[in-house]
Structure formats: structure tokens, C-alpha cells
Design a protein with these regions (language model features):
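Glycine-rich FAD pyrophosphate-binding loop
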Residues: 24-44
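Dinucleotide-binding Rossmann-like beta1-alpha1 core, especially the glycine-rich loop
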Residues: 48-131
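Helix-loop-beta segment of a Rossmann-like dinucleotide-binding subdomain
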Residues: 130-167, 188-191, 201-202, 276-285, ...
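C-terminal catalytic lobe of FAD-dependent flavoproteins
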Residues: 153-155, 163, 223-273, 279-360
Length: 360
């Protein structure tokens, strides 16, 4: 316990590993503790996209979308070997968002974030474009195509951790934080190796809680602070089915309930479909897609793909896999990325900074 780290980070997801890399790159001493493996939780259960959040434009979250799109360009330039462009087809569905609204939203999406290399939006005639072939005949005539990026989410986490370690950070997997106490401006942190059971102590000037859906557990059990009433867990489930189309573009489908559902080419022979959005209570480690969520996603794609004469309730998709990331929403808003930025200008006070999990 001779060394007192500048920053101790709890959580080995994309937030924790990203902070570790950033801090270590600035010359700060860093220790990161993850009770399981890197990206064992939400960060490997995502929709596997690097995107700006097109749907957030409807909520006038212009600053958020602009920042996300700008960071998309940065990430793509840093890791082009695991982040790749992906074209999305957005069919216009009568009775839902009007075509002018989709055009306006995609125009903003193209220009608000300083897009430099990705291809821009174009209008599609779905009666002649190959993207219209898998869709229900006669149901969709007009569509739009725009660009975002896809990513191997777990590998992105590991690469951040690897780079942080190369810059001097100590990355401790299978290491659980049991207790953290602050005295005289320094955090004393009790650690336990979950495999051997051995315990050790570390000290740090600042503590970052980046435990994702376990953030309140760390806050209350380890730090001894009261739980926050404005924190809620949100589950977004995905399913994997045999591929619904043969081309390499993805679909973003509108639902009558106002939500959107992605259908994305996945591992050559499959289609990834997601996501749902519901409140979650219980142990995040035991989260799984409910029958209702599976039915919701199957109905959503069945209303767009296949024979229009089929009843969505009786159309069966061969379910190959599913996963359900649990994210944390603060007061009903999406994950507050700005909390990460407090580390950019200088070390924060010797307090605890809590970060929600990545958005779904």
C-alpha cells in the first residue's frame, strides 16, 4: 500500500476503461477494479453501434447528438480496425412520422456533428432498390438511407483497457471492491480477489464509480452513501434470428408506439433485432429477455418483413440468442456522458464521481 493512486475506478466497462485510458494518457496514476471480466456487463450486451442517436433529435437533444456524432468520427479514426461504416435503411411508414420530418431529421443528422468521411443521406425508391425486396410488398414505397458505424463492443472495451495498461494503469479483473472509506482527503479501498479470496488495500485521491447498473450497489454497500431516488434501471433486450435479408445494410423500423427497432446483419448468417425499453428491478446479472419482449421484437419486424398477409402474432422467427443490457437512467434522461468530462481539465476533488452505464 505504498503507492497512492491519483484515481481509482470501479467498473471495467466502456466508461471505466475509457476513463482509465484517458487519465493514464494524461500522466495520472490509475487503478481499475472489475469484479468480473472486462465488458462482462452492459458493455458487451449492446446493439453494437457507434451512433449519434438519431431518435434523440425528436426530443431536441441537439447538443447530445452533436457531441455523439463528433465522437463517432474520433472513435472511427482511432480504431478503424473494429469500427466500420454501416448504412441504415429507414422505410417511411404511412400514418407514422411524415416524410418531411424524416428528411429534416436526417439532414440535421448529416450536418450537426461535422461529418467528414461517412456517406450522406439519400432517398430510396423501395419499389426498385434492393433494400425493398425483403420488405412486405406494396407496404413501403419511400425510404431513406443514412450512415452510422458498427463496433465489436467488447473488443473496444478491452482495447481501451490494454492501452490504459500500456500507459501505466493497473487493471485488476476478478477484483471486487468491498469497502471504500475517505479520510484526510484520501480513499482507502478494500479489494478482494474473487478467485483466490485474497484481500489487499489500495489508496487513491479520487474514486470513480463506473459500475454501470451496479452503480447504486457500489455507492451504498461499498461507500456507505444513501441510494438516490432519481436513479432507475432500464432493460433493453435484443434477439438474434436467422438472417432476414441478404444484403449488408441494416434497417431502422418505425413502430406505432413511437419507438424504433433495429434489424442489423450479424455474424454473417444472422440478424440482430433490438431493442426494447422497460424498467428493471432485481439483480442485473440475472437479466434476460422476457417472453413479452421477444414477442414485441418479433411483431415489430414481422410488420415490416415478409408476406403482408401473414398475421404478426402467428409469424414465427427462429430465435437463436438473446441478451438484455441493463443501463442506468438519471431522472429519466439518457446516460449522462458529461460526468466523464470532469476528469478532462484536472483531478476532481477527493470525492466519489458516479457514472451511469452506457446508453443502449
Amino acid at each position: 500500500m505504498d503507492q497512492c493512486f491519483d484515481i481509482a475506478i470501479v467498473g471495467g466497462g466502456i466508461n471505466g476503461c475509457g476513463i482509465a485510458r484517458d487519465a493514464a494518457g494524461r500522466g495520472w496514476s490509475v487503478i481499475l477494479c472489475e469484479k468480473d471480466d472486462l465488458a462482462a456487463g452492459t458493455s458487451s450486451w449492446s446493439t453494437k453501434l457507434i451512433h449519434g442517436g438519431l431518435r434523440y433529435l425528436e426530443n431536441y437533444e441537439f447538443r447530445l447528438v452533436r457531441e455523439a456524432l463528433s465522437e463517432r468520427e474520433v472513435l472511427w479514426s482511432i480504431a478503424p480496425h473494429i469500427i466500420r461504416p454501416l448504412r441504415f435503411v429507414l422505410p417511411h411508414r404511412k400514418g407514422l412520422r411524415p416524410a418531411w420530418m424524416l428528411r429534416l431529421g436526417l439532414f440535421l443528422y448529416d450536418h450537426i456533428g461535422g461529418r467528414k468521411r461517412l456517406a450522406g443521406t439519400r432517398t430510396l425508391d423501395l419499389t426498385t432498390d434492393p433494400a425493398g425486396l425483403p420488405l412486405q410488398p406494396g407496404k413501403f414505397r419511400l425510404g431513406f438511407e443514412y450512415s452510422d458505424c458498427r463496433v465489436d463492443d467488447a473488443r473496444l472495451v478491452v482495447l481501451n483497457a490494454r492501452d490504459a495498461a500500456d500507459r501505466g494503469a493497473e487493471i485488476c479483473c476478478r477484483t471486487q471492491v468491498e469497502r471504500a472509506e475517505r479520510s484526510s482527503g484520501v480513499w482507502t479501498i478494500q479489494l478482494r480477489d474473487v478467485i483466490s479470496g485474497k484481500r489487499r488495500t489500495a489508496q487513491a485521491k479520487a474514486l470513480v464509480n463506473a459500475a454501470g447498473p451496479w452503480v447504486e450497489d457500489v455507492r451504498s454497500r461499498c461507500v456507505g452513501l444513501p441510494a438516490r431516488a432519481h436513479t432507475r434501471l432500464v432493460q433493453g433486450s435484443h434477439i438474434v434470428v436467422r438472417k432476414l435479408f441478404d444484403h449488408d445494410r441494416a434497417y431502422i423500423l418505425q413502430n406505432p408506439d413511437g419507438r424504433i427497432v433495429f434489424a442489423i446483419p450479424y455474424e454473417r448468417d444472422f440478424t440482430l433485432i433490438g431493442t426494447t425499453d422497460r424498467d428493471f428491478e432485481g439483480d442485473p446479472a440475472k437479466a434476460s429477455a422476457t417472453p413479452e419482449e421477444v414477442d414485441y421484437l418479433c411483431r415489430a419486424v414481422s410488420e415490416s418483413f415478409g408476406d403482408k398477409n401473414e398475421d404478426p402474432e402467428t409469424t414465427e422467427l427462429e430465435l437463436r440468442a438473446s441478451w438484455s443490457p441493463i443501463g442506468e437512467n438519471m431522472a429519466g434522461h439518457i446516460s449522462a456522458w458529461c460526468d466523464v468530462l470532469c476528469l478532462a481539465a484536472g483531478l476532481p476533488p477527493a470525492g466519489v464521481t458516479s457514472l451511469p452505464g452506457p446508453g443502449v
